[in-house]
Amino acid sequence: MPVTIKDVAKAAGVSPSTVTRVIQNKSTISDETKKRVRKAMKELNYHPNLNARSLVSSYTQVIGLVLPDDSDAFYQNPFFPSVLRGISQVASENHYAIQIATGKDEKERLNAISQMVYGKRVDGLIFLYAQEEDPLVKLVAEEQFPFLILGKSLSPFIPLVDNDNVQAGFDATEYFIKKGCKRIAFIGGSKKLFVTKDRLTGYEQALKHYKLTTDNNRIYFADEFLEEKGYKFSKRLFKHDPQIDAIITTDSLLAEGVCNYIAKHQLDVPVLSFDSVNPKLNLAAYVDINSLELGRVSLETILQIINDNKNNKQICYRQLIAHKIIEK
């Protein structure tokens, strides 16, 4: 016979209604009781009916993840699997499922999000990128639907989880300056992304602080995070200035292209990158932005926002995750 809520309640020493409230993740149930009920569910191999549960609670127990425009680069980039792992860990701990919103262009992604929001297919959204004047974020904010951004926002009313990317850019540049480098190049992602702008700002601030010249011919931006872009811009950099003595990239895929160019031309130029990196890359160091923790805190925060929404609370959460430079 299939296991029922009554069986779980008996095993956990609570009432069936308490089991139902635990399944609905109600804030009125203590963490200790939730833990006991979930342990009983696991031991009895009980799986609640998601559709029936959503009809009763009006909540789906699903979180939507909004991908950036370039989804191909998303799946190639080691940063995102690490973030997703953190998100999935917390989702699993809280009995939530994940649904991804993507599309080949902005119109398709807007349509996917509209279906999620107006169709009540998810309880909240996490945007896995941050850029200025995003119509997708505007739609969700206007509908007062629970969401947060993994990244930066200029609006003080948008919840977010991020690193201090200005400081991270400064620290990365300072690392090379303290090694004696003076002609440091910067290869970043799209200029419309806050993360690129902030890391560039930190780079420029460090050069200014140490009284080094900022040369715009040593700065390049890639519209896509792809290995070939890193290779292409490395070629341009060394053509302009063969004396470049260090390169900072804001992404591990760009770093791969840079390292390939340097290896092919037998150059002795150190490279530093951000995010999770391929251990095979010959980097001098990388900035560990703690992408796993970014994912975990993002999911924990959106669940708190959803819970606040249930209780008619309005709190704008803005959390920063620490970074550190790791030498290889």
UniProtKB/Swiss-Prot annotation:
Residues 282-291 are annotated as: Dimerization. Residues 5-24 bind DNA. The keyword ATP-binding does not apply. InterPro entries: Cro/C1-type_HTH, HTH_LacI, Lambda_DNA-bd_dom_sf, Peripla_BP/Lac1_sug-bd_dom, Peripla_BP_I. The keyword Transcription applies. Pfam families: LacI, Peripla_BP_1. Transcriptional repressor of the maltosaccharide utilization operons malxCD and malMP. This is HTH-type transcriptional regulator MalR. It comes from Streptococcus pneumoniae (strain ATCC BAA-255 / R6).
